[in-house]
Amino acid sequence: RRLVEKDHPSNVEFPGYFKGAVFQGAMTGADAFFFPSYEETEGIVVLEALAGHQHVVLRDIPVYHGWVDDQSAELCHSVDEFVDSLEKVLSGQVDKRDAGYRVAQSRSIDLVADQLVKAYQQVLEM
């Protein structure tokens, strides 16, 4: 908690500690969304970053397989890869924001709801 509240560079923000319009502004106004976590349950925060047209730099972990790939985000395995990816993103050498946004669109709540309705209809027809 001390790191989040005091001991970090002034250009670093921790999204879990602000909400609403402030969160939306941070997600759309940041230079990049950097999420090096070893664990993630569903990837909702990543989906939010993709929907906000962010440059996304992630650790390549299984929860993202099948929906986030190297076309839509920078996927890394080591500190050196994270440094390299962040440098490429921040210097403008790579820009995967449009592809990332398409991933977010493909997982929109409306599309997911339609899929759920179809699944229920199939079960009812059995």
Name each model-derived stretch.
Residues 51, 55-58:
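Short hydrophobic beta-strand element within catalytic cores of glycosyltransferases
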Residues 1-18:
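Nucleotide-activated donor-binding/catalytic signature segment of Leloir-type glycosyltransferases, i.e.
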Residues 17-18, 25-30:
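Short alpha-helical donor nucleotide-sugar binding micro-motif in glycosyltransferases
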Residues 94-124:
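A charged, aromatic-enriched C-terminal amphipathic alpha-helix characteristic of glycosyltransferases
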Residues 43-46:
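Short glycine/serine-rich donor-binding loops of glycosyltransferases
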Residues 38:
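Aromatic "clamp/platform" in nucleotide-sugar-dependent glycosyltransferases that forms part
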